């Protein structure tokens, strides 16, 4: 099957998304699995690993990169548990990157157009973000971004066209500086 995914029309991954329930009351479970192809060239994860840095993946990071460049992984358990794991990792000594994927806003609420669920997930993340920020060391850097929009108030179930933010924070990062 992997040979079929390469060439001019190649894809990076095939996603298996299990559902529970029956129509129209079915829902996705967190037990998804990505069958990925290895990245075609070196990634930032590979470069960090080659320098002896920790590359810790939380959520589906290992799956997305087929494990390439990842030194430690914690599979997806949903946003709240993924943030709990991230805060646990943050409290340990490590030197490198902790790459976290919080997929609930997209997978569970965005595509299903569940505005109340989406708002609840953001509220929960906001609470945990406060704890994360309080634990940041002076030389830590936090980057928050997304790969696409998924407005739960829009029609249909596809991705939407919002601009994707890139928020960067660190106690030693100066405002207005080109990173």
Residues of each region from the PLM?
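Feature captures the catalytic ectodomains and active-site-proximal regions of enzymes
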Residues: 1-179
